[in-house]
Amino acid sequence: MDHITVPKVENVKLVDRYVSKKPANGILYLTATHLIYVEASGAARKETWIALHHIATVEKLPITSLGCPLTLRCKNFRVAHFVLDSDLVCHEVYISLLKLSQPALPEDLYAFSYNPKSSKEMRESGWKLIDPISDFGRMGIPNRNWTITDANRNYEICSTYPPEIVVPKSVTLGTVVGSSKFRSKERVPVLSYLYKENNAAICRCSQPLSGFYTRCVDDELLLEAISQTNPGSQFMYVVDTRPKLNAMANRAAGKGYENEDNYANIRFRFMGIENIHVMRSSLQKLLEVCELKTPTMSEFLSGLESSGWLRHIKAIMDAGIFITKAVKVEKASVLVHCSDGWDRTAQVCSVASILLDPFYRTFKGLMILIEKEWISMGHKFSQRCGHLDGDSKEVSPIFTQFLDCIWQLMEQFPCAFEFNENFLLEIHDHVFSCQFGNFLGNCQKDREDLRVYEKTHSVWPFLVQRKPDFRNPLYKGFTMYGVLNPSTVPYNIQFWCGMYNRFDKGLQPKQSMLESLLEIKKQRAMLETDVHELEKKLKVRDEPPEEICTCSQLGNILSQHLGSPLTNPLGFMGINGDLNTLMENGTLSREGGLRAQMDQVKSQGADLHHNCCEIVGSLRAINISGDVGISEAMGISGDMCTFEATGFSKDLGICGAMDISEATGISGNLGISEARGFSGDMGILGDTGISKASTKEADYSKHQ
């Protein structure tokens, strides 16, 4: 708060570059963590919150007719144009924002003051939620070829590696230490990912300190041991992610790349991914294109091309695809490095892991991958993201490019990822917000020195709580997609508008397909909740609906009301005995057509039984029971009666059209209606008595 000289400024305008009308006034607030702009007019009083650590640059422009302009460009690609009345106040706000956005000390970062009102136990469990070492257990490590060693527990081997590393089981500690002395920043070759299907491994390290002629026996032994963990292949790839010219230039400085003559059975490949300085310049050119107010198609496309951004994304993806094919198709292990092994190496190993393993396309998988390949393996988040006031030449969008590669894969395989675009954007926001401790410092040792596990909170529990917001509605499940084989032809590499233009809504913001799907999913969940509530109401009835809506119960009801005239027509007419026996004995000798009529009765009775079963099936399908009606939206009327289209009569009675002949002794009023309905009282309507004619016929039969 010492840097805030003007906490509140009135009559401030927030200019929208898409809106030509005069901007409305508002109030600008400066806090220790956020810049907040509140519109002074309007019923909603819209608020704009900008985290101070998101601010990349603050630019104070010359005074105009509107006032004193102040432009903020943020690391999450928001651009805010404010206009203040007073030049003096504008200057004070400008100085405050410069100091607040990039503090000099790590302890001044937001994470050390952020307090979500959780207990100490909750904070500690949050840090244990994602464990990168457990991922190696998922790969079956330790095993006969690989071991997890804590030889780096005091950071004696490599200060930028985690305390526990995975190395070949056959090598000695002396070999590992000797190899580390031959690698830049002591970043010795260690396991990144093991493809269990064929034991092919992806390992990572930094460039060797070979110069033109230097060699190291321990380093050669370690690479040979890595190769021998995969007996299914006679060679191992060594992938240098840099352009060959850059690697050769490093040789002159005593570094460089492996000499194939000194290493047994290796095949060397260059990937041509540019360094951090080229990437920083490329992003700057891209953002200049994004800030054009009314660009023509030619201006936008030519600017996008000249930035080279999509070419860099393609190069990273091509490298990941090469490693994937080497592991899956050629069954060969791969060792990956760049210069120091914490930028391009992290990008390429992560992309290859996502292509090979569907686990990394889930919420937990991506969080573990980021923790394992980026945080614990020493990506320099503090310097690359510009968290503190320091050398601007160390800032570079390396992690942003990694998320861009994931988004490119999501565009080509929309059903293969459990999370959606918003999950990537949320992670990107918190990498720069400094609200959580995960991305502070440049390595694991830095975070321990800062005591982030005691003083700050982990971002992963926060993201897990919001999983419903980040879930991909098109996700087909863990096992639907195996190894991904994306295309990197030019027309498949797209500009990620949702990242770089996410805050430019324009006059008529386009409707996001993802938002539409999520809204549909939300509405579906609400309807399912309504149905569940209705089902609970149905169970309140005294008699369970399934006891009413069964063929046996239906038959009992018919028997009670009719004496089973359909299933036993002779008994109903007062004739004892089986029909066939009576006919053979001549008992039923009246009229030759009587037997045919009785056969017809039995046939109709069987048909009725079948129809009853069909009706019961329909009742079960639409959950009809009791006096509780299902809403009119489902096509069912109030008193437990469906409308005519469902095929049930209003009174739910059995009546009329399918009369059994008078010879059977059942009146024409007793039958199955055209609608085949049942009464709400489950009773039988109409005259159930025996007609006069049929009674006489029955008496005549008795006399016979």
Curated annotation (Swiss-Prot):
Output one GO MF annotation.
Answer: phosphatidylinositol-3-phosphate phosphatase activity
Q: Which Gene3D superfamilies match?
A: Pleckstrin-homology domain (PH domain)/Phosphotyrosine-binding domain (PTB) (2.30.29.30)
The entry marks the following residues as binding a 1,2-diacyl-sn-glycero-3-phospho-(1D-myo-inositol-3-phosphate), namely 250, 275-276, 339-344, 384
A Pfam match: Myotub-related
- Kindly list the positions annotated as binding phosphate: 339-340, 342-344
Domain of life of the source: Eukaryota
Q: Which GO terms describe its cellular component?
A: cytoplasm; cytosol; nuclear envelope; protein-containing complex
| CDD domains in the record | PH-GRAM_MTMR8 (cd13345), PTP-MTMR8 (cd14584)
State the compartments where it is located: Nucleus envelope
Q: Which reaction does this chain catalyze? A: a 1,2-diacyl-sn-glycero-3-phospho-(1D-myo-inositol-3,5-bisphosphate) + H2O = a 1,2-diacyl-sn-glycero-3-phospho-(1D-myo-inositol-5-phosphate) + phosphate; a 1,2-diacyl-sn-glycero-3-phospho-(1D-myo-inositol-3-phosphate) + H2O = a 1,2-diacyl-sn-glycero-3-phospho-(1D-myo-inositol) + phosphate; 1,2-dioctanoyl-sn-glycero-3-phospho-(1D-myo-inositol-3,5-bisphosphate) + H2O = 1,2-dioctanoyl-sn-glycero-3-phospho-(1D-myo-inositol-5-phosphate) + phosphate
Instruction: Look up the signal peptide feature and give its range.
Output: none
Query: Mutating residue 255 to A: what's the consequence?
Result: Decreased phosphatidylinositol-3,5-bisphosphate 3-phosphatase activity
> Mind telling me which PROSITE patterns this protein's record contains?
PPASE_MYOTUBULARIN, TYR_PHOSPHATASE_1
- Binding-site list for a 1,2-diacyl-sn-glycero-3-phospho-(1D-myo-inositol-3,5-bisphosphate): 250, 275-276, 339-344, 380, 384
Question: Keywords on this record?
Answer: Coiled coil, Hydrolase, Lipid metabolism, Nucleus
The record's InterPro entries line, in alphabetical order, gives: MTMR8_PTP (IPR030591), Myotubularin (IPR030564), Myotubularin-like_Pase_dom (IPR010569), PH-like_dom_sf (IPR011993), Prot-tyrosine_phosphatase-like (IPR029021), Tyr_Pase_AS (IPR016130), Tyr_Pase_cat (IPR003595)
Domain (Myotubularin phosphatase) ranges: 126-500
Instruction: Give the protein's biological function.
Output: In complex with MTMR9, negatively regulates autophagy.
Membership in a protein family: Belongs to the protein-tyrosine phosphatase family. Non-receptor class myotubularin subfamily.
Which protein, by its recorded name, is this?
Phosphatidylinositol-3,5-bisphosphate 3-phosphatase MTMR8
Q: Which species does the entry assign this protein to? A: Homo sapiens (Human)
Instruction: Read off the lineage from the record.
Output: Eukaryota, Metazoa, Chordata, Craniata, Vertebrata
